[in-house]
Amino acid sequence: MEKNKKIIAGIAGAVALIAIVAVCIFAFGSGKEKKITENKETTTVAETTTVPETTAQPKGISMLTGEHISEKLADKRPVAVMYNNIINAIPHSGIDNAGIVYEAPVEGSITRLMALFENYGKLKKIGSVRSCRLYYCYFALEWDAIYCHFGQSKYALDFLKSDAIDNVGSFNAESGYYRTSDRVAPHNCFTSAKGIDSSIKKLDYRRKYKNGYKSHFSFATDNEKISLQSTKQANKVKLGYPVNKPWFEYNQKDGQYYRFQYGKKHIDDQNNKQLHCSNIIIQFVNATLYPDGKSLDMTLTGSGNGWFITNGKAEKITWKKDQKKGRTTYLDKSGKEIVLNQGKTWICMVQNEYSNDVKISK
């Protein structure tokens, strides 16, 4: 009997030992599997918190470029700065930050640029800044922009002093500008983010887009690339302006048009980058002289022809504008508004009599 008890006890002990070993194996094995599972889950969580557009993408969309920007910046009125563009005034400063640039002739067949900015907050040097011509006021109004200039033609003064346009000029905010010693006057006048913002505050201008304002342009959506149906290749675009002789060259790798003028790259001296854009609009317009026989005026209402150039191709378009303070629409051959690729745009006003000087080639 005693022997049987010992046998039973031995068997029980063996069973217990086996059970303990099994539990340990299970415990260690489970722990190992749990660790792998946790790693997998951690990796999955990391991916879902960094990839989704709802968290990674800013909420705002730029009215100027169609690109994602901060919501605060997207609601901020742009400023439109008049840039001097004769050879004594270059290199330009700060213009690479602009989302839209207008180029148009003034007297003597030189051009001036009007650069529209949303994001200029860190710029200490913007310019050089030059005087206003009346038709530039209407360009600025199309974007609900605050217009910045230093000086003006006599034909623009009454308009600027009225409440028709919010503007920062030498007659109402001279302290917002400063002069440098690196070039001679009048080509050495500059402003800055601080100068612009302090002037806007002083003049008590509205800082957000007006109620109901809608984007001037329609832009491609994310990951969409507009490719024109036209067969006309546009790898080089000469604008036909006789003095600065500007042109753009298309880079297929990044889809950008890089700008040249005065025989060399058009550079922003604040970052040493060559100016470039995703879209070019050429608008043919009628121009006349004021009674003084030298000041230029442009007919911006009615309709006319032009070119839309993007992604290596060009197509003929028409433009329409019903009233001076209205919005210019650009239409394709089917009568639909053009859709632009996201990014910067240059809008170039060319007098009808010089339309044949515009050259678009392979």
State what each model feature region is:
Residues 23-36:
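Hydrophobic single-pass membrane-insertion segments
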Residues 2-4, 38-41, 46-102, 107-362:
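A surface/extracellular/periplasmic glyco- and lipid-processing/surface-interacting theme
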Residues 2-16:
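N-terminal Sec-pathway targeting helices
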Residues 19-21:
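ASCE RecA-like P-loop NTPase motor cores
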